[in-house]
Design a protein with these regions (language model features):
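Collagenous Gly-X-Y triple-helix signature in extracellular proteins
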Residues: 1-196, 205
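Residue-level detector of alpha-helical secondary structure
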Residues: 206, 210-213
Length: 215
């Protein structure tokens, strides 16, 4: 099936729809008066959540290796001509599984989906062939001493299930962003894509070629 793209505004893409913008493919998760929440359709890179030891904040996204990587991605987009205003700030709640809030909420223009966000939108999110990080810590240093894995971070496995892993494991990075609903994006034109020469019987195709060359 041929893939023909057409331009539409992001506001006209349905939730769960796949679109292309900034040279990347995304899935639209939700929309409100602020903009459209989107997730990368694919993993952009694989890396540890955190390298080295940090007993105070071992699984805090703000102090992770992932945030500098995402910052570089944002800088590359703007360097290539995309206005910074295209990336609407979004708030990421770093509350852990037990309800501890010591990492707080921080505002970024590009980040990771939280466990709560994944729980809300998982039906819309395409599975990928490698595990990928979420923003949510499993536990934090100030959680109950009876809580295990207080240095772990939640991630999504290839089958779509959630689990927790040590922060220095190497998993996928699948960014979440918020774009304006007025952003022009590209989507597949399903109506046009239905036509393909591969679906035309060979005899009909040869007859058409003959009629055009003899006319």
């Amino acid at each position: 099936m041929s893939k023909i793209l057409k331009s539409v505004t992001l506001g006209n893409v349905k939730n769960g729809g796949i679109f292309k913008a900034l040279g990347k493919e995304f899935v639209k998760l939700d929309a409100d008066e602020h903009g459209c929440l989107v997730l990368a359709k694919d993993i952009w890179t694989k890396m540890p959540f955190r390298e080295g030891d940090d007993p105070e904040c071992p699984n805090d996204l703000r102090r992770s290796e992932i945030m500098p990587y995402l910052g570089n991605c944002l800088a590359e987009f703007t360097k290539n001509g995309t206005p910074l205003s295209t990336f609407i700030p979004l708030r990421i709640d770093l509350q852990d599984t037990t309800g501890q809030n010591e990492y707080g909420i921080f505002e970024v223009r590009i980040g990771l989906l939280t466990l709560r966000g994944y729980g809300k939108y998982w039906r819309l999110i395409p599975k990928v062939d490698a595990p990928w990080w979420l923003a949510t810590p499993y536990g934090t240093p100030n959680c109950s001493p009876y809580t295990c894995n207080d240095s772990d971070v939640w991630y999504v496995d290839t089958d779509g299930s959630g689990s927790d892993g040590w922060y220095n494991f190497s998993y996928g990075v699948r960014p979440v962003l918020c774009f304006s609903s007025a952003l022009l994006v590209s989507v597949e034109d399903e109506r046009e894509a239905r036509f393909s020469l591969a679906n035309v019987p060979l005899d009909d195709l040869l007859a058409e070629i003959k009629s055009r060359t003899e006319g």
